[in-house]
Amino acid sequence: MSLSRRQFIQASGLAMCLGALPFAVQANKSQPTKLPLPPLLESRGGQPLFLAIQKARWSFNGQNKVQVWGINGHYLGPTIRVHRGDDVKLIYSNRLSEDVAMTVGGLLLPGTLMGGSTRLMSPGESWSPVIPINQPAATCWYHANTPNRTAQHVYAGLAGMCLVEDEDSRRLPLPKHYGVDDFPVILQDKRLDNFGVPQYDPPANQGFLGDTLIVNGVENPFVEVARGWVRLRLLNASNARRYQLQLSDGRPFYMIGTDQGLLPAPVAVQQLPLAPGERREVLVDMSKVENVSITAGESASVMDRLKGLFEPSTKLVSTTVLTLKASGLLPLVTDQLPNQLVGDNPQISSSIRSRQLTLGDYSQGINSSILNESRIDITSQQGAWERWIITTSVPQPFHIEGVRFKVISFNGNRPEPQDYGWKDTVWIDERAELLVNMMQPSYAHFPFMYYSQILEMVDRGVAGQLVVNPAGF
């Protein structure tokens, strides 16, 4: 193959640059870091849970500590654990210099308690909802939901995990010792400058994509685990990036839960997609291996990294999510993987209404309408079942507050096993059909939202408002 004069000059120039590059660019720039474990915050005896939204200092690369936002003095927030049947008081306090709104994605709450724009906190203000926990065990997440600023606030660090436990989750022989065999794994992508400071420039369209994979606030983490089953609660808290996860040794994950709770039975999944806002619970068998890594596709080449010195890159420098290292500790869960987890036999007692929604890009909104907070887009009834047929001109994740749904089909085909179970967030590429169950009431002044989970797109109005009239109304 012959090279033109221009190609030869370009190749020679790049080769000279590569020779002069620091090792940090030619190889993985980050050394393995122990996985940070968010503090566990658990309601006991009716005591309130305090969540101070404030500035903090944090190091993403294990070197420079930089100013970030977070909760209770940490980048990201503590892991909240609540129990079905409890009434839990959360006290959010805004210690920042701008307005902030918060919500808990996945918690099935009335519209009055959902948060968001109707519960905006000015600097120095607090919001103290008492939330009834009345749903099956699930992995949820709380995060900023500030009008027109959600993307920037979540990127800055206003997010954390919320775990719901119930009798089933306590009864089943699953790993459940937080930080020992049960770990939160929060994925984000960022763009860091030479000092480790996160850079954020809203893209002209679509959503923000960084070049550095961050897990629980650090690059390239590892965690030491006991031999046996390890439970990972995966959350994609990225603004827009979707991940395809797999184990480095080719073994499958055993998925046991999704957004709205445990699956009827474990499902072996070779590749695990994880869209923004989605949660997945998986088990990994560490009984016969020394270590294994979770990866998220191919990392950027040296050439890509070189280009990234001169212009922002959207390719991840490293795609290692987390490395599990087996220690000499005996497993806390010695049972075999259970064949059945929870029952799932919903009773549909009403006629099913169909709705058509078209998700556009940032300029088109939903059904050709940008969000208008004075307009209610959909009205339904608590307990109702509906069939939502959603089409997209741009592949994107979609979320509905206050409901749970099952995926009936993608583009006319049955969903893959990883999309079984009850969900509240789903990746849609062209067309999806959902069976939606209206679980909680909402009101004209406190409506639910449904929206693109690409955070920049919801900030631009790719969203709608849903009122669910109370049962018997």
UniProtKB/Swiss-Prot annotation:
Predicted to be exported by the Tat system. The position of the signal peptide cleavage has not been experimentally proven. Keywords: Cell cycle, Cell division, Periplasm, Signal. One of its GO terms (molecular function) is oxidoreductase activity. Residues 1-27 form the signal peptide. It is found in: Periplasm. It holds the Pfam family Cu-oxidase_3. Its main location: periplasm. GO terms for biological process: FtsZ-dependent cytokinesis. GO terms for cellular component: cell division site; outer membrane-bounded periplasmic space. Transmembrane segments: none annotated. NCBIfam families: PRK10883.1 (NF008135). Cell division protein that is required for growth during stress conditions. May be involved in protecting or stabilizing the divisomal assembly under conditions of stress. Belongs to the FtsP family. This is Cell division protein FtsP. The gene is ftsP.
